[in-house]
Amino acid sequence: MIQGGDPKSRDAKPGQMLGDGELGYTIPAEFVTGLYHKKGALAAARQGDQVNPQKASSSYQFYIVQGNTWTADRLKMVEDRYGKKFTPEQAEVYATLGGTPFLDGDYTVFGEVVEGLEVVDKIAAVPCGPMDRPIEDVKMKMTVIER
């Protein structure tokens, strides 16, 4: 998984801690059928359930799912442990493409990488320092395609 969006990151010094930039508001959780945490999903980060039981999304931080492939047995374990139910389509995608199914229904997915999944893997593989920040900054540029 790769994460970005902190407004402080544009001018951050090497090694500076990121992730606590504020815009002063959150966005209500929105769980849409058909949008789930398959590899390449674009989702909103958020604070944990202890301080955010409404699962409201960050107004600025996002992540892109990388994830591994999942066998039927492992998906069944996720269903049992987290009380989730996956459609046959989701099970097929998680088995072939991969993702992070245990996050479904807990974090808002609002888009996906439609081209360049190999870039997600390359970004996820860069050497990182403390707090999982890349030693050399990786700048991401995104284009929004509306359907």
Describe the residue ranges of each PLM region.
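Cyclophilin-like peptidyl-prolyl cis-trans isomerases
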Residues: 1-147
